[in-house]
UniProtKB/Swiss-Prot annotation:
Marked site: Cleavage: 112-113
Disulfide partners: none
Keyword terms: Autocatalytic cleavage, DNA damage, DNA repair, DNA replication, DNA-binding, Hydrolase, Repressor, SOS response, Transcription, Transcription regulation
SUPFAM superfamilies recorded: LexA/Signal peptidase, Winged helix' DNA-binding domain
Top-level taxonomic group: Bacteria
Leading EC class: hydrolase
Protein name as annotated: LexA repressor
Family of this protein: Belongs to the peptidase S24 family.
Lineage: Bacteria, Pseudomonadati, Pseudomonadota, Alphaproteobacteria, Rhodobacterales
NCBIfam families: lexA
Gene coding for it: lexA
Length: 227
């Protein structure tokens, strides 16, 4: 097993253990510092051929860990069949009623111009599937206003579930507070001493700020959409 294969398998199992779903190919590429996703495809194929993982057809982010190298087993990780759930449309969706529903505070809309503290809408709450929550830390919900993240599957009017935290990994979608007065939902990238907040819509430009101007307020862990 090559070093890169080991690194990728370790990253996949760490993210699945933390989030319950595999990372995206973009997240894998960034984690391994590769220039393109083709390298990730080759590593995934090699891991599958060696029997460490299994890809499930016609499902987004559908990777199942089958076994681990002895070195990882000795480190204390128990290989488990952790995989993304599938449903007709959208992929991975579940009904609130079947997922151990919990109430979270709905703090308002995530839109440019207001920090999280200022958009607290009072005692409103929203019911979310318990499986979205990590079991540790505080969570809250926000209503999305705008279309800057549509390519990431986040639409205007969606409810996003956020886990409160002050740090983020490259590629995470976060609530970021800029210059202590503007909150935004964007993909987080560290570039040396700068922080890039990337939209998922070509109509918007990436925002780049000095590190000290950006405070992570939380990380996206789930999304709720009404039809």
């Amino acid at each position: 097993m090559t070093r890169k294969q080991m690194e990728l398998l370790d990253f996949i199992k760490t993210r699945m253990d933390r989030d319950g779903v595999p990372p995206s190919f973009d997240e894998m590429k960034d984690a391994l510092d590769l220039r393109s996703k083709s390298g990730i495809h080759r590593l995934i194929t090699a891991l599958e051929e060696r029997g460490f993982i299994r890809r499930l057809a016609h499902r987004a982010r559908a990777i199942e860990i089958v076994k681990l190298p002895e070195a990882m087993e000795r480190a204390g990780f128990s290989a488990r069949a952790a995989k993304a759930a599938a449903a007709p449309l959208p992929k991975g969706a579940v009904t609130v009623e079947t997922a151990g529903a919990l109430d979270l505070p709905l703090m308002g809309r995530i839109a440019a111009g207001l920090p999280i503290e200022a958009i607290n809408g009072g005692p409103q709450s929203v019911t979310v599937p318990g499986m979205m929550l990590s079991g540790r830390g505080q969570h809250y919900a926000l209503e999305v206003k705008g279309d800057s993240m549509i390519a990431a599957g986040i639409n205007d009017g969606d409810i996003v579930v956020i886990r409160e935290q002050q740090t983020a990994d490259n590629g995470d979608i976060v609530v970021a507070l800029v210059a202590d007065h503007e909150a935004t939902l964007k993909r987080y990238r560290r570039r040396g001493g700068m922080i890039a907040l990337e939209p998922a819509n070509d109509s918007y430009e990436t925002q780049v700020y000095p590190e000290q101007m950006v405070k992570v307020q939380g990380r996206l862990v789930g999304l709720i959409r009404s039809y």
